[in-house]
């Protein structure tokens, strides 16, 4: 989170992320302004499979209490520039992101096996 306590997210314009938990658990928080339901919480474990985070999606994650090991495989598109893709975005500085977090109920996803 940023210096005023607002949530910080990453967003990529030229990269999709594929995240797979190999140990422990991790919760991903996703916001995509183009989706019908823009706010999602996704709880992943080893049994869950990979999570696709498409470009244009605000995302952040947090390990479960036992910690986690996650593999992130990226698919990059023409126009990718590492110096421009990996910067945090604060909800306090992005009005659309702030409004989704404040006004939308998250869709919660968990795989139970």
What are these regions (language model features)?
Residues 46-59:
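Conserved SET/PR-domain catalytic core that frames the SAM/AdoMet-binding pocket
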Residues 1-46, 62-113:
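Active-site region of the double-stranded beta-helix
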